A protein has these predicted regions:
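Conserved catalytic core of the tyrosine transesterase superfamily
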Residues: 1-356
């Protein structure tokens, strides 16, 4: 990402890009929808608003294509009273439609229960805004049950797999030759530093790629990250992360970055700030060699860190704080199965008689 303005941080640039993208998406929605997105601006990120805009657009696309009375209507001509014409049964049909539907671009789309719930949450929020301001008389979204979410098992690396992954990144070049060997040598220290950092701090991949070299403080072994929502936080790291970062920085000193990318901590092979997708592909590439049964992504490395920290400390509030969860219930929900394991061990730990 180009730093045309050297005073802008990576986070600021992403916000600007997302704001511009949102404006483009809003042009494809009914004009009255802008009021809603303007109203939620203070309490949501631009990225969240973009997701909501796409979700709301699917709803209007559904109305225009599936409702016979609206067949000849155009998106730009829809007014707010269209919302009052929708009944609870229409919302239920929409939920059914979301499971499998043709998108505006004639591509078949599907939604699992999480995608379904997110789209329904967006629609509820959209309706609530106009209902609260008495611009519509009814809110049919309140009459329809939200999709039920089933708990998903947390996918994480076991301690042995974590060690195997780091060992593989460090030594897999021994079996390589030719161009593959050259590429590996160019990316080895960077890849090891990124994976070690993700495993050793639990930061998000978006936070990782957004790091500038100035964000690392080896005096306190802390990194400054911009959390989801824009808040700033110092996250501390241990000796293994410190060593991996220092080794990478030594290699990084020999790279001449593309203009505007001088501050980026992690570079792509094009000498620009590395992107989220590049990190995701890199993690998947290495993880496939270590485990074939688990689909490991950067987020799974974050789950691995959270699991390890909770096992070591048993402090759910500490885990929530370090992971940057605003609500401890989010953390507790993810690690509920581990709580059950701890309760089982607690039952065995208490002896009432020495020889029952």
């Amino acid at each position: 990402m180009d730093k045309n303005n050297h005073n802008m941080t990576y986070h600021d640039q992403v916000t600007v890009q997302n704001t511009l993208k949102l404006r483009e998406v809003l042009k494809t929605l009914p004009p009255f929808a802008k009021d809603y997105f303007r109203a939620i601006e203070p309490i949501t990120s631009a990225k969240t608003r973009i997701s909501y805009a796409y979700d709301i657009r699917i709803f209007f696309h559904f109305l225009l294509t599936e409702n016979p009375s609206l067949k000849n209507k155009q998106m730009e001509n829809l007014t707010v009273d269209i919302l009052d014409q929708v009944q609870a049964v229409d919302i239920e049909e929409y939920q059914e439609y979301l499971k499998v539907y043709d998108s505006e671009f004639d591509k078949l789309q599907t939604n699992g229960e999480r995608g379904l719930k997110r789209k329904m949450s967006a629609l509820r929020s959209f309706y609530a805004y106009y209902y609260k301001r008495e611009m519509i008389k009814t809110n049919p979204t309140l009459l329809v049950d939200m999709p039920k979410l089933h708990d998903k098992e947390i996918i994480r690396l076991d301690p042995d797999e974590t060690a195997d992954l780091l060992d593989y990144i460090e030594h897999c070049g021994d079996q390589l030759t030719g161009q593959k060997k050259i590429y590996y040598e160019k990316t080895k220290y960077r890849d090891l530093a990124i994976v070690t950092l993700l495993l050793g701090t639990g930061i998000r991949v978006s936070e990782c790629v957004g790091l500038d070299v100035e964000d690392i403080d080896f005096k306190s072994n802390g990194i400054r990250v911009i959390r989801k929502g824009g808040s700033e936080m110092i996250v501390y790291f241990g000796e293994e992360v410190e060593l991996a970062l220092k080794n990478y920085l030594e290699y990084r000193n020999n790279i001449t970055p593309v203009a505007g990318h001088e501050h980026a901590l992690f570079y792509s092979t094009q000498r620009k700030r590395i992107g989220i997708q590049a990190v995701e592909n890199m993690v998947k590439k290495y993880a496939r060699e270590v485990t074939t049964t688990k689909k490991i992504t950067p987020h799974k490395l974050r789950s691995t860190y959270g699991t390890t920290l909770y096992r070591e400390t048993g402090d759910i509030y500490l885990v929530a704080d370090v992971l940057g969860h605003k609500d401890v219930n989010t953390t507790r929900k993810h690690y509920a199965a581990m709580d059950d394991d701890r309760r089982r061990r607690a039952a065995k730990a208490v002896r009432l008689r020495e020889n029952p």
